């Protein structure tokens, strides 16, 4: 076959690859036991696929890390990241911040505890902050295998004092797993500050277009990489080559997109604070945010992310609920209600119907701010608020 000098890695949809001879087949399968990131010979797409490896290298460049393992969803990334530390009866306890993605908390309750019978502990925030005296007490008492947290919580956008958390956990020899979906490698690279693994729901900002589902685990330790590749291979947590190819094109605009997300969110949060229909705006870039100092210390002048949470004014639970619903209805054709985030288009999500008893706040809405023209966004949202 004639060699084609393509400027981009092609889309390889093959389920398996031609090994050509028995000798080469034996060598390929022997080498496969090493679970290298990029094999000399590709065998089967559930093991490794060249299109996927190319996208992984792009993420490695963004994270400034030695390896990245792409999977089909963010939840698959979480499964791999925590499961590679499990060793049957010798599995040690683990400690999770409670202010993490709701799906992760369900995974903890319904998989790690209910089905795997693991010893899992949680650390709770108090009044929008993390109590480090309590965190150290738990680390000392539990002696966990790892500590799992998010740099920016969802939906209250609590920014963690991550360097202090990592330093404290290291004193107790706990590994560090960070879900940095909200922060992204644009704002913070956890591995450079001592984290052992960083995970992302690639579905969100890294992809940014709402048309693929994917997750990724990143690290520097080669043994953890081999464990992650083996777990992905044996559980089938593999991203499709088509999605990996699409992701590869989307990653090229990631930094440009995310800067615009940050710029728009800061401008919109400032705008919302001045609206008489709004009771509270939560955005880490605002002086009113309880963890603005932590956000500035962590992110510097790069931005504060693309998420805003705000609460409408109201005289009662029912009044707030009705105003929330009118606001959502007024934007139905322009800013849709979609339970995801990080897309180029602005989308919204009501808090109480999703988080329930954890956040029984009927007037509260989460905005995933897109990269549209900011003046148009202000006009749309201002017009909806004027109908309250």
Name the predicted role of every residue range.
Residues 1-35, 53, 69, 86, ...:
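Acyl-CoA thioester-binding alpha/beta core of soluble enzymes
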Residues 20-21, 25-27, 32-39, 44-48, ...:
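Active-site C-terminal subdomain of aminotransferase-like
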Residues 150, 327, 367:
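Residue-level signature of catalytic and energy-coupling elements of molecular machines
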Residues 66, 115, 120-122, 126, ...:
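PLP-dependent enzyme catalytic core of the Aspartate aminotransferase-like
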Residues 55, 81, 227-228, 323-327, ...:
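Hydrophobic side chains in well-ordered alpha-helices
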Residues 5, 12, 67-277, 282:
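Conserved PLP-enzyme active-site core in the AAT-like
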Residues 16, 21-76, 80-84, 103-111:
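Conserved N-terminal alpha-helix of the aminotransferase class I/II PLP-enzyme fold
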């Amino acid at each position: 076959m004639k060699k084609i000098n393509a400027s981009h890695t092609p889309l390889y949809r093959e389920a398996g690859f031609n090994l050509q001879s028995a000798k080469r087949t034996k060598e390929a399968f022997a080498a496969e036991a090493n679970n290298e990131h990029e094999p000399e010979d590709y065998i089967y797409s559930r093991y490794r696929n060249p299109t996927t490896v190319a996208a992984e290298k792009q993420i490695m460049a963004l994270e400034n890390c030695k390896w990245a393992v792409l999977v089909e969803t963010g939840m698959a990334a979480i499964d791999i990241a925590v499961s590679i530390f499990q060793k049957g009866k010798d599995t040690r306890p683990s400690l999770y911040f409670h202010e993490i993605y709701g799906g992760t908390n369900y995974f903890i309750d319904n998989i790690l505890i209910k089905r795997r019978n693991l010893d899992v502990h949680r650390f709770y925030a108090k009044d929008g902050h993390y109590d480090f005296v309590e965190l150290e007490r738990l680390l000392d008492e539990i002696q966990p295998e790892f500590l799992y947290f998010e740099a920016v919580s969802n939906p209250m956008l609590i920014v963690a004092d991550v360097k202090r958390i990592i330093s404290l956990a290291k004193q107790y020899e706990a590994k560090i797993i960070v879900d940095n979906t909200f922060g992204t490698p644009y704002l913070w690279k956890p591995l450079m500050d001592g984290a052992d693994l960083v995970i992302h729901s690639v579905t969100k900002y890294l992809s940014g277009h709402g048309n693929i589902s994917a997750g990724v685990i990143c690290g520097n330790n080669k043994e953890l990489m081999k464990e992650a590749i083996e777990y992905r291979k044996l559980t089938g947590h593999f991203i499709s080559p088509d999605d990996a190819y699409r992701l590869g094109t989307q990653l090229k605009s990631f930094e440009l997109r995310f800067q615009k997300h940050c710029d728009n969110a800061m401008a919109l949060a400032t705008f919302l604070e001045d609206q008489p229909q709004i009771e509270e705006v939560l955005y880490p870039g605002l002086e009113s945010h309880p963890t603005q100092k932590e956000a500035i210390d962590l992110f510097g002048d790069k931005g504060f992310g693309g998420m805003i949470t705000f609460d409408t004014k109201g005289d009662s639970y029912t009044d707030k609920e009705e105003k929330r619903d009118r606001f959502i209805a007024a934007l139905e054709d322009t800013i849709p209600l979609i339970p995801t985030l990080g897309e180029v288009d602005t989308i919204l999500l009501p808090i109480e119907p999703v988080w329930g008893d954890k956040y029984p706040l009927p007037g509260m809405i989460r905005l995933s701010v897109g990269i549209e023209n900011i003046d148009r966004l202000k006009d749309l949202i201002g017009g909806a608020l004027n109908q309250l």
